[in-house]
Design a protein with these regions (language model features):
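N-terminal-biased segments
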Residues: 1-15, 41, 246-262
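Histidine/acidic residue-rich metal-binding segments in metalloenzymes
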Residues: 3-97, 102-121
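Glycine-rich, acidic/polar active-site loops that bind/position phosphate-bearing ligands
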Residues: 123-309
Length: 309
């Protein structure tokens, strides 16, 4: 890798990208909403949406999705293309409005909160998390603009794991500011919780994996002789990473760096075939989003099946 600095965040709609593409007054309004809360005006949202769409299309994107985290343990999404009805000359237009950026209306009946209700009764609404940057995901389906969102009901009840997190962060900030004021600081306006969510995982050769129904159906070993402690020779915590495992880690790092994930530390773990990836601490909701990206990218990586527990 010749230039990690240039690679890092290259698939993310960062503040630097917004500064380049948004009018100065719009950029300031967006940053204020990100740092201090509040809503964007419809006109501002339209400008941001157009800039985001233009950036995504220039990088090969054809669709966008509101990327959210329902009560299933993994992320969910629905893809919509940027195309609109052709004009009178039959020319296809690509558009993305502020309304489409800020809010979506997916069917929530298939999620745990849906119960036995019909699809038209179990509505769910996605709401843009402006503090978490949009990013581009590229795979066999193409290049998709992923917009991190919260997921709630018509009346505002949380239907996901992110909404309670955002509300908790706000509550912590409000109460922590009271303590900050006691120490004489009158300038601070916000206290931001941070998280460093390391991932420990097992790498199992595909041929061996397919022989174990417990791994296939449960994601863990349920039968067989207990493994020895190991670590007596060169397979310990600080042991040299095997070349095949190292190649996997290298590929993961490159993908994560493109998406702005600060993958920092990698090493063997205590159990046989166990390894770890740890990012740098980040703002709590960003760390949670990045953790989902880590799991998605890791599980999709080349001929190895990874189990995270």
């Amino acid at each position: 890798v010749k230039d990690v600095e240039a690679l890092f965040g290259s698939r993310v709609f960062t503040r630097a990208t917004m500064r380049e593409r948004l009018p100065k007054n719009v950029y300031k309004e967006v940053i204020k909403a990100m740092d201090c809360g509040g809503e964007l005006s419809p006109a501002t949202a339209d400008v941001v949406a157009k800039a985001m769409k233009d950036w995504a299309v220039e990088n090969g994107a054809t669709h966008y999705t509101h990327w959210f985290q329902p009560l299933t343990g993994i992320t969910a999404e629905k893809h919509d293309s940027f195309i609109t009805h052709p004009d009178v000359d039959g020319k296809m237009l690509m558009e993305f409005s502020g309304k489409e950026l800020i809010k979506g209306e997916p069917d929530a009946s298939s999620f745990p909160s849906g119960g036995l209700r019909a699809t038209f009764e179990a509505r769910g609404y996605t709401a843009w998390d402006i503090t978490s940057p949009a990013f581009l995901r590229e795979d066999a389906t193409g290049v998709i603009l992923c917009i991190p969102t919260a997921f709630c009901s018509y009346k505002g009840e949380a239907l996901d794991t992110k909404t309670p997190l955002l509300r908790s962060m706000e509550a912590i900030s409000q109460q922590a500011l009271r303590i900050v004021r006691l120490f004489g600081n009158t300038e601070a306006t916000r206290v931001i919780p941070s998280v460093g969510a390391e991932q420990e995982y097992f790498l199992v050769d595909r041929d061996n994996y397919l022989k174990r129904e417990d791994l296939i159906f449960a994601g863990r070993t349920l039968f067989g002789a207990p493994a020895p402690k190991g670590q007596e020779m060169d397979d310990h915590y600080f042991g040299t990473i095997r070349e095949r495992i190292g190649a996997y880690m290298k590929d993961i790092n490159l993908e994560l760096w493109k998406l702005g994930v600060t993958a920092k530390t990698q090493h063997n773990e205590a159990a046989p075939a166990q390894h770890e990836l740890a990012p740098i601490y980040d703002q709590a909701n960003l760390a949670v989003d990045n953790n989902q990206i880590v799991m998605e990218k890791s599980e999709a990586q080349a001929g190895l099946r990874k189990t995270m527990r």
